[in-house]
Amino acid sequence: MQQFDVVILGAGSAGENLANTLAQGSKSVAIIEEHRVGGECGFVACVPSKILLRAAEVRLLLHEAHQLGAVAASLDAGDGRAAYARAVARRDAIVPDDDGFGAQQFADNGVTLIRGRGIILRPGVIGVGDDELGYTDLVIATGSAPTVPPIPGLDTVPTWTSDQALTSPEFPTSLIVMGGGAVGCELAQIYAAFGTAVTLVQSAPQLLPQEEPKIAAILADALRANGIDLRLDVEATKASRTDDGGVALTLKDSTILHAERLLLAVGRDPRVEGIGLDKLGITPGEKGLETDEYCRVRGQEHVWAGGDVAGIAPFTHTASYHAKILTANLLGQHKQADYRAIPRAVYTTPTVASVGLTAAQAREQGYTISTAGVDLRDTARAETEGTTHGRLELIADKARGILIGAAAIGPHADAWLGEATLAIRAEVPLDLLSEVIRAFPTFNEVYVEALDQLRGDGD
């Protein structure tokens, strides 16, 4: 049996980064991957979705060309099906077919890559097929998979998960998107921009239920303007196959929706089944494995977790951050994770971005807060861009005079919210933030009025 200092289950963003840095730190490392090195982000999620979202954004901008004075009359975006085929061809040209690059990095760094499914056999031993590997420390980084909701009849109708949609060349003429989170909103806008008749069904009263209501409402208006039929605060109760092979989805209010296909975007589940956690006495929670501030699985001395399976925030950048924390701790440096400023982004047009706590979350946690909100239309940059959809909201802890949350919607909001991300992480005083000189004309100017509101006590 081969013995390693560290064995990692899963070569996604957390596992891949961790394996390479640990090996460079003179640890003997084996990493076990059942699918592809690099995880889902680069192959079936983040990267292909952003390629298609960029194409969708350009098509939407064509409708604004006349308003901006760029052309004499409104431009026709042309046949959506043909355009989608071209966008898919570009997607497939950019997204790699295999994981050769990642596998070669492992080889260059001395990481042992083992293809297959790793299962915990007993403390200190992992099985892969007929082989056994010994470890001193085990890192579980198995990621997550799209949630399939328990709706009667779902197995009889043509469905996609988000992973399947983002790798398929198929262009449906009509589509029901189930789920109004980040993935559901992005995919709904992609297909609508190319001409698909899209209906989005969301069980919560608003889109993006974890975000500020005013931000979510602005996004809802934008999606409706794209022709997307939003059905909010309603659940699906039954699915059935129509005579023409499509979908009939029955809602709780007895409405029946029809479409060529149903796209499931209701969340993701941590991959914790069938990997032998019971052999270590580990019982996962609904969100995954519970970890301490060092990314160690609670109740375990030599078992760690990172990425989606740790249940903190299901983002690639969180997984990469976990890799840094895990590297430090497995090398004996005792570094604690700090999750106060994990940015979130929804790459729709307009873009939604947020960081830290919402106002509701802050109040629930006992903070006495002040809040501020400013529309982007109050900035010169919004005038030059012809932007009508946009807003910044800030949440401050009154007692300490620092930001603890921020949310934004507007062009490139993911970029200009970086100022708030840094301010929250570094606990920059509001007085100091107010003294920052911001270039004119930029969207960052919206911070000036918002910070003035906070210093004047906001709400």
Residue ranges of predicted features:
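Flexible, glycine-rich terminal cap/loop adjacent to redox cofactors
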Residues: 7-35, 40, 47, 51-58, ...
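Hydrophobic "anchor" residues
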Residues: 48, 126, 270, 297, ...
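FAD-site-proximal beta/loop scaffold in flavoenzymes
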Residues: 155-171, 256-329
